[in-house]
A protein has these predicted regions:
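DUTPase catalytic domain/fold
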Residues: 1-145
Length: 145
């Protein structure tokens, strides 16, 4: 198991945790002093009140919670958000309201999930042409024959 160092910015912060043995992500909670309202079509940056030290060769991905998306149209604007291993600031989440109603966020509401992922660095090699494949240059919808 990989160790992730985490710092609370306030004593009353609830740390992320896996809700089940099979969970891939840990829920992130909103660290807001008062209710935040997100109007339809609006985006807001929401604090979590935590900072982390991610081990080298890992990243954290911030992803939407499926329940918020399905029930309220709430998503993350830059999904998945990437937190690099050398970042040491507070984790914040850019929420967007794609729904039709005003959405309210209160302190400790679960707003996103955090997934720790290994990364693989690659060495780029510029070439004049690429190897051929059956698919070739077929793009969007090209495999729906």
């Amino acid at each position: 198991m990989v160790k992730l160092l985490i710092k609370k910015l306030h004593k009353n912060i609830i740390l992320p945790e896996y809700k089940t043995d099979g969970s891939s992500g840990m829920d992130l909670m909103a660290n807001v002093e008062q209710t935040v309202k997100i109007l339809p079509g609006e985006k807001k940056i929401i604090s979590t009140g935590i900072m982390v030290a991610i081990p080298e060769q890992y990243e954290i991905q911030i992803r939407p919670r499926s329940g918020l998306a399905a029930k309220n149209g709430i998503s993350i604007l830059n999904t998945p958000g990437t937190i690099d291993s050398d970042y040491r600031g507070e984790i914040k989440v850019i929420l967007i309201n794609l729904g039709k109603d005003i959405f309210q966020i209160n302190k400790n509401d679960r707003i996103a999930q955090m997934i720790v992922c290994p990364i693989i660095k690659v060495k780029l090699e510029e070439v004049e042409s690429l190897p051929e494949t059956v698919r070739g240059k077929g793009g969007f919808g090209s495999t729906d024959k």
